[in-house]
Design a protein with these regions (language model features):
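Acidic, His/Gly-rich catalytic cores of divalent-metal-dependent hydrolytic chemistry
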Residues: 219-252
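Phosphate-coordination/substrate-recognition cap region in phosphate-metabolizing enzymes
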Residues: 64-131, 251-252
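Short hydrophobic alpha-helical segments enriched in small aliphatic residues
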Residues: 15-16
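Loop-to-helix element that buttresses phosphate recognition and phosphoryl-transfer chemistry
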Residues: 34-93, 142-157
Length: 252
C-alpha cells in the first residue's frame, strides 16, 4: 500500500511538473508599461497626442525600469508609442535588453483635442459639462478634435490581436500611455470597453496580461516597486518617491 501511495504521488508530481512546463511554453506575457513622468504630468495637464518630453524625474524612472526589466527574463520584442515620452522610455529599456524598439501608432494615447494642455481647473472653467461628467458620472459631450472611443477601441484591439498572432509564447513589452494601457487591458481581458477607464496607472508602472490554456489573466497591475528609492525633490533635497504627489493623477 505504501508503495502504491508513493507511486501515485510520484506520478502526480511528474504530471503536474509536465503540465507546468507545457503551460509555460504556451504562455504569452504582454508587459504594458507607462512612460516616465513629464512636466505636464507633474502639472496635471492633459497630454493626449501632444508630444511632451520626459522630465528629469521621468528619465530617472525610465532608467530604473531599464535596470529592472532584465530580471523579468528574456523578451522577444519591444513596441512603443511614437510619442517622445513613451519612445524614449522604451529606448532606455531596449538598451538594457539589447532589443530595438518598434514604433507602433496604435499605442498612441487617445487624442483629446481641445482639452490637451489644460489642467482640471482649466477644464472646469472652459468645459464645465466635461468636467462634471468626468467627476460625477454620466455621458460627457463631444470634445472638439478628440479621437472617438470607437476608433480608440478599434486600434487597441487590433494591436492585441496582432501581438497574439505574431507572438504565441514568451514575453513582449509595450511602452505606452495611461489611457491606452486601460483600453489594452479591457480589450485583452475581454472586459466591457464602453465602461469608464477603471485602472489607475502610474508613470513608469508595469502591468502584465498573460494568455495561456485558461484564457487571459491579469498577472500584475500598476507595479512601481522599482521606484522605491530616493529622488531629488524640487528644492534639491532627497525625498522618498512614495511621498511625492502628482496632481490630477488621472491625467494620462
Amino acid at each position: 500500500m505504501r508503495q502504491q501511495i508513493l507511486g501515485a504521488a510520484s506520478w502526480q508530481i511528474h504530471h503536474g511538473f509536465r503540465n507546468l512546463v507545457y503551460n509555460q511554453l504556451l504562455m504569452l506575457k504582454l508587459y504594458l508599461i507607462r512612460h516616465g513622468e513629464t512636466d505636464w504630468n507633474a502639472e496635471g495637464r492633459i497630454q493626449g497626442h501632444s508630444d511632451v518630453e520626459l522630465n528629469e524625474r521621468g528619465l530617472e524612472q525610465a532608467r530604473r525600469l531599464a535596470a529592472r526589466m532584465p530580471e523579468e527574463g528574456p523578451f522577444d520584442a519591444i513596441y512603443a508609442s511614437p510619442l517622445r515620452r513613451a519612445f524614449r522610455t522604451a529606448e532606455l529599456i531596449g538598451q538594457s535588453l539589447g532589443l530595438p524598439v518598434i514604433g507602433d501608432a496604435r499605442l498612441l494615447e487617445r487624442s483629446l483635442g481641445m482639452l490637451e494642455g489644460l489642467t482640471m481647473n482649466d477644464i472646469k472653467e472652459k468645459f464645465p459639462e466635461v468636467h462634471h461628467a468626468w467627476h460625477e458620472g454620466g455621458t460627457r459631450p463631444h470634445i472638439p478634435g478628440e479621437e472617438t472611443r470607437e476608433a480608440f477601441v478599434r486600434r487597441t484591439s487590433e494591436f492585441i490581436h496582432d501581438v497574439r498572432a505574431k507572438h504565441h509564447e514568451g514575453r513582449v513589452l509595450a511602452v505606452t500611455h495611461g489611457g491606452t494601457i486601460n483600453m489594452l487591458l479591457l480589450t485583452g481581458l475581454n472586459l466591457d470597453v464602453e465602461r469608464p477607464l477603471p485602472f489607475h496607472i502610474d508613470n513608469a508602472s508595469i502591468n502584465i496580461v498573460q494568455w495561456g490554456e485558461r484564457g487571459a489573466r491579469l498577472r500584475l497591475l500598476n507595479d512601481t516597486c522599482h521606484l522605491n528609492a530616493l529622488f531629488v525633490g524640487a528644492g534639491g533635497a532627497l525625498e522618498p518617491y512614495a511621498e511625492q504627489k502628482i496632481t490630477a493623477a488621472e491625467v494620462q
